[in-house]
């Protein structure tokens, strides 16, 4: 594959005529041209055009091993200089072509380089410069592509010398007392001669400038994009050309956007093009460009969503704070739905893009990503509610696909010991480069600890709930009231995310599935691939109807001490009593009367050979309960639901339970001890 290089526009803050005067001494720069001679020189219509053909030798900037194979120390170049002086259209074209007909290697390598100097279209006191180059190696021991990439990489390391050379000779002219060269103007002779030769020769058009004054010069790169290598600059220019004809419906991406997608695909132009095209199509279909002006935050989200923008970090990145541990995930999903939470996330991402541009202007340096601080104080097993995790994975997929490289740093503070479970589930779906930006602070004092968050956020900007002096987002752990939970399906198709193509997680060995959390991630992933869960009760929760006085007992035999039993259920109709029991005996599910318990037999006595480990709690209609319990010993655990005899009608509920392996919790069980008074919080 032919390797291409295209430079951004370099700006010389000198008039075109002065730059050309310095350019005439170009061949005196011995570090670039070893020796040469003029073999042909012609002039057309006076000074309007001058063509100079030159043989020269240029050092072959390649690895030593390649030079040994090629048996060449220098490249013989055929250089063609074309100097146009035509009215106001001043252009110098320089063409380099590798040529050595008596060497067999010349038939296997093709090198072409073209440089252009031209007057700045908007400022006559400045001169523009750009260059292109191609390298094509054929039949080179089967490693042509690798050699081409190596050669182009070596070439780009020398491109910056071009500007230094011209600067050197302009300064040399100044030392000689030449600080001004008369401007070339249209005189009668040149005009008449030009008119006679117009049918034969047409000066090349000036290269068009980028729209919106976004000309990609060195100053623009330093101010808005940051430090880039010449090869990265070239990739950026080439990608821009693929999207330079924007429309009102499909606006041309700015350089910051192009650079983000290039970084996300390791500067592969083809991969970045495909990713960006899909994202632009998605933005058009979902009207993302108008989301900042049209989106209205639901009242429930404004009141109960614990997140918001908060100043900047020490690097100037906009800082967003999310108190995930205080969030009632189930309540929010049931009140506004999964689609609305996705739209909220996209609105936050669009705000982040706007704030990054403002920060760039405010701090006078490139700011092309933002910082996220996530407070996990209060995180418990209730956050592992399966539909909630599924919604989170969908949000991650959408953001990773359409907002790459916007996350500069993620600060995870006050992470409890249950956090590794959630991290195991979601990290599989986060890009590896993004995962490397996560920093974890597990202790309660994450502010003053060694390498604490003071290293990343100014002390006067640290929130008060972390020990700082800045008041922000004071959200106690609170469940949404019944009045706002409308039992909305947590997953729907009104917001189309089909453009987000989910790729399978990295392959794992069979031993990896000893982590139940990883298995959860896989099952959620492939459930999403197959269309997802249309409703949080479908295929996951089981329904139970209980008459007044009737019991339903779920027997769970445990052979894995220190494993964790989790449950989640929702009462749909009438009051229900719930409790958890344990016995060391192994009990089989029997066909006993539904109005009696397995512990009603003569072989069982409470406190002797079985005990109640979760006290009975009354659950009212439309209440949801999540809980967990460490199964410290083997035996049988019993989840029991009962419709009180005093009820005037049958009770209905939906339930789900899961056992998490002890392999994930060794030495980390304290945070999982749950009762209804602490970690097993009710979510309404």
Curated annotation (Swiss-Prot):
One of its GO terms (cellular component) is mitochondrion. Residues 297-474 form the CRAL-TRIO domain. The keyword Glycoprotein does not apply. It is found in: Mitochondrion. Residues 2-178 form the PRELI/MSF1 domain. Residues 537-684 form the GOLD domain. Keywords: Mitochondrion. This is Protein real-time.
